[in-house]
Regions:
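Thiamine diphosphate
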Residues: 1-164, 169, ...
């Protein structure tokens, strides 16, 4: 594991943009008066002529990005997840998704870990909304290393991509020599025979914590990092279900429509088995420190451990 203890993936996004901008002259970045918060300010300072601040007009920004993509540019649209998937949904669907344009949507401040900003800014529905758009790739990186890799992979992929980044710092878990990011391919971080914990985003680190606690009780858990919600790595999901017979999904997102739903849909078709979904249970969030909210909504390592044990 890296010596870097924790990094917010929104910071990873900003740094990755700058690094990519040095070699990709057709990369342009659009923001909606949030360059400081989304960390696109890092790119803006390095390449001011390729950064466009559209003001507080997310729908217009999305349309501008669509137009730029038809002129040979690769636009990265940047704003909070609530605005990217909510306020601009119609434009994302019709202006980017429908014509399958080469636009990348970077949504920061996702999930309840937004913290004190409260329920109106804690988007726990974005993965569901974006997953249902035909042809949209949906990525939810688990840490700094993965977020940077996702940005480059998104740039190299032709078509619409939605990427989810967080405000709160999270542990770096992928800083290993053999780490490889590939769109649509999950990563097995730990193998066990008793249960498969399939996690995404910041919950991957918490899933690993839970697996350690389970191991102390003699329960061997497989832990899988699904960084790409769509296309889902169905082969890996089915293999884990066959090997353990019990699957638990964990996400900092509603239990409706996100990773849990995607995994359940896959196994319903391919290998029916018990699936327990851990996430935000059909409620709005509230204002508070990110760490406290993670615990309150049962998404920390201890809570996951308890819920996995109860499901066995």
């Amino acid at each position: 594991m890296s010596e870097v203890k924790a990094v917010a993936t929104r910071d990873s996004y900003g740094n990755a943009l700058k690094a990519l901008g040095e070699k990709a002259e057709n990369l342009v970045v659009l923001d909606a008066d949030l360059a400081g918060a989304t960390k696109t300010s890092v790119f803006m300072k390095a390449f001011p002529d390729r950064h466009i601040d559209c003001g507080i007009a997310e729908a217009n920004m999305t349309g501008i990005a669509a137009g730029l993509s038809t002129c040979g540019f690769v636009p990265f649209v940047s704003t909070f997840a609530m605005f990217a998937s909510g306020r601009a949904y119609e434009q994302v669907r019709n202006a980017i998704g429908y014509p399958h344009l080469n636009v990348k949507i970077a949504a920061t401040h996702a999930g309840i870990s937004v913290g004190e900003d409260g329920a109106t800014h804690q988007c726990n529905e974005d993965l569901a909304l974006m997953r249902e758009i035909p042809g949209m790739v949906v990525i939810n990186p688990s840490d700094d290393v993965e977020a940077k890799a996702a940005v480059e992979a998104a740039y190299n992929y032709y078509g619409p991509v939605y990427m989810r980044f967080g405000r709160a710092a999270c542990p770096v878990i992928n800083d290993t020599p053999d780490y490889k990011f590939e769109i649509g391919k999950g990563i097995t971080l730990r193998e066990g025979k008793d249960v498969a914990i399939i996690a995404t985003g910041i919950e991957v680190a918490y899933a690993l914590e839970a697996a350690e606690l389970l191991a102390a009780d003699g329960i061997e858990a497989t832990v899988i990092n699904i960084h790409t919600i769509k296309p889902l790595d169905k082969e890996l999901v089915v293999a884990a279900a066959k090997a353990t017979g019990k699957v638990v999904t964990v996400e900092e997102h509603s239990t409706i429509g996100g990773l849990g739903s995607a995994v359940a849909e896959c196994l319903c078709d391919e290998y029916p088995c018990k699936v327990t979904r851990i996430g935000v249970n059909d409620v709005f969030g509230e204002s508070g420190p990110a760490g406290e909210l993670i615990k309150k909504y049962g998404l920390d390592g201890q809570s996951i451990y308890e819920k996995v044990k109860a499901s066995l």
